[in-house]
């Protein structure tokens, strides 16, 4: 009866003077592991144009059917290829963050980023379109999110 009580107190006193395990979350953020799969990001090439060629392989590879894509003919201002994604949407309520879209992309246009703050106030905000997924044009492709391009 007294033995378990002593064991419990010894464990408590052992951890009492160690540094805390918890993190003050809004002020401090824990760095993500290299293989962490967060919010998807659409990449740009070295000229600042979109990399997506609208092949639709990401949409086909998605087991949750979370990616919707509409292709359109390109005039050379959006990207270098003949087609581009006129509509590109990812439904976050369906996405299971498996990374199959990243693996299926032949031109490395989409990858899983490190962003994990995905909370929104409205259900409609869970559908992210191309403008919300595209990397800003000023960021160099090789240094985006610390990831190398293929």
Where are these regions (language model features)?
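Non-ligating segments of multi-cofactor redox enzymes
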Residues: 1-103, 107-150
């Amino acid at each position: 009866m007294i033995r378990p009580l002593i064991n419990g107190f010894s464990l408590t006193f052992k951890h009492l003077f160690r540094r805390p395990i918890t993190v003050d979350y809004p002020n401090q953020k824990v760095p993500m592991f290299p293989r962490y799969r967060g919010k998807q990001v659409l990449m740009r090439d070295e000229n600042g144009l979109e990399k997506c060629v609208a092949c639709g392989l990401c949409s086909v590879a998605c087991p949750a059917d979370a990616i919707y894509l509409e292709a359109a003919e390109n005039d050379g201002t959006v990207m270098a290829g003949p087609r581009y994604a006129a509509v590109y949407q990812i439904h976050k309520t369906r996405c299971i963050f498996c990374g199959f879209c990243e693996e299926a992309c032949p031109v490395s246009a989409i990858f899983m980023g490190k962003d994990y703050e995905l909370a929104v106030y409205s259900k409609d905000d869970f559908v992210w379109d191309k403008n919300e997924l595209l990397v800003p044009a000023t960021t160099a492709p090789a240094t985006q999110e610390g990831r190398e391009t293929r």
